[in-house]
C-alpha cells in the first residue's frame, strides 16, 4: 500500500450487554455517513421499494438483517455505490460476517453506530479498496459500566409518622458527580420488615405506610452504571 491509498472500513460489534441482552452494531465509514450527496442518492433509490426504509431512516433507527440483505441485492443501490467507487464486494463480506453470528435471522436488528451500552463485544473490521483484496480483522471490546453513586432522594430519618410516610419519597437515584443520571431504569429497591401487628411486609414496588419497623435496600441491576448498594432502616409510628 501507499500513503495515498484510501480504504473504507466497516466495523461490526456483536456481543452481550450488562443486561444479558444480545446487541449488534454496524459502524459505517465516514464516507457514507457524512456524504450528503450519497445519502440523497441512496434515499431516492430506496424510496420506491416496498417495506424498505430509506438510508437516512436506517442511520436513525437501525436496520434488520433481512432489510440489509435486500439492500445489497437492489440493482439501483449497487449502481449508485459502484458509480462513486464503493467496493460492493466488501458489503457482501459484511453479510458473511453477520451470518456467522450465533442465532442470526432476518429479524435481527442492527443498530448503526458504535456500542453505547456497557458489555462485551467481538469486533470485526472489514476494509475495502478496489485495488486490493477485501481485508478482515477480528478483535474484542469491553465497555465497562461507569462508576456512579446511589443516594436516597429524601432523608426520612430513623422515625417517620404514618401520615408522613404516605407522602414521603422513599426512592433512590443514581448520581454522577452529584448530578442524577438521565437513565434510572437500573435502580431497584426492596422493602422488607414487620408491621406493628407482626405482619411480614415485602415489596419491590411499594414502600410501606403502616406502623412497623422496616429495612430498605437499593441496588443497581444491569445498565450502563455500577454502584454499591445502600441500605437504611426506619420505623413508621402512628
Located regions from the model:
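Solvent-exposed beta-strand/loop surfaces, strongest in extracytoplasmic domains of secreted
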Residues: 1-238
Amino acid at each position: 500500500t501507499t500513503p495515498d491509498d484510501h480504504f473504507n472500513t466497516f466495523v461490526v460489534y456483536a456481543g452481550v450487554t450488562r443486561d444479558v441482552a444480545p446487541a449488534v452494531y454496524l459502524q459505517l465509514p465516514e464516507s457514507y455517513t457524512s456524504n450528503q450527496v450519497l445519502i440523497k442518492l441512496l434515499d431516492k433509490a430506496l424510496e420506491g421499494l416496498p417495506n424498505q426504509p430509506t438510508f437516512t431512516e436506517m442511520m436513525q433507527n437501525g436496520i434488520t438483517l433481512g432489510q440489509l440483505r435486500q439492500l445489497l441485492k437492489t440493482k439501483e443501490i449497487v449502481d449508485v455505490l459502484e458509480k462513486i467507487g464503493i467496493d460492493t464486494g466488501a458489503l457482501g463480506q459484511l453479510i458473511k460476517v453477520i451470518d456467522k453470528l450465533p442465532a442470526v435471522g432476518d429479524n435481527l436488528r442492527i443498530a448503526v453506530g458504535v456500542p453505547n451500552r456497557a458489555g462485551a463485544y467481538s469486533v470485526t473490521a472489514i476494509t475495502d479498496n478496489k485495488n486490493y483484496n477485501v481485508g478482515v480483522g477480528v478483535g474484542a471490546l469491553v465497555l465497562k459500566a461507569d462508576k456512579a453513586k446511589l443516594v436516597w432522594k429524601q432523608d426520612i430519618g430513623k422515625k417517620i409518622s404514618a401520615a408522613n410516610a404516605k407522602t414521603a419519597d422513599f426512592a433512590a437515584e443514581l448520581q454522577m458527580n452529584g448530578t442524577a443520571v438521565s437513565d434510572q431504569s437500573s435502580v431497584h429497591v426492596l422493602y422488607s420488615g414487620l408491621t406493628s401487628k407482626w405482619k411480614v411486609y415485602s415489596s419491590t414496588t411499594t414502600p410501606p405506610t403502616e406502623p412497623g419497623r422496616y429495612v430498605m435496600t437499593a441496588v443497581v441491576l444491569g445498565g450502563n452504571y455500577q454502584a454499591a448498594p445502600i441500605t437504611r432502616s426506619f420505623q413508621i409510628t402512628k
